[in-house]
């Protein structure tokens, strides 16, 4: 995925039976992806490392280690690292079918 590195923790293949998934993603790029995530369910994020920006539809806001936020169902979302900062690493979780 280019400047994104994803590690999956839970999926339907290893324990989630209702369509849930969780993992970590490292966002090394300082640009927002032109292919944001969009899901039929909400997705929660917790920032583990780094500093950057999250974009939910047209809303852009700063994020840093210790922050958390939720992308509601159907909301396009993407993350980028702030220039000159450590890459943003997030833990994410979403569930439902």
Regions found by a protein language model. Give the residues of each.
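A short glycine-rich, His/Asp/Glu-containing loop-to-beta-strand
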Residues: 1-36, 95
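Short acidic-glycine-tyrosine-enriched beta hairpin
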Residues: 58-73
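A generic beta-sheet turn/junction motif
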Residues: 40, 56, 83-85
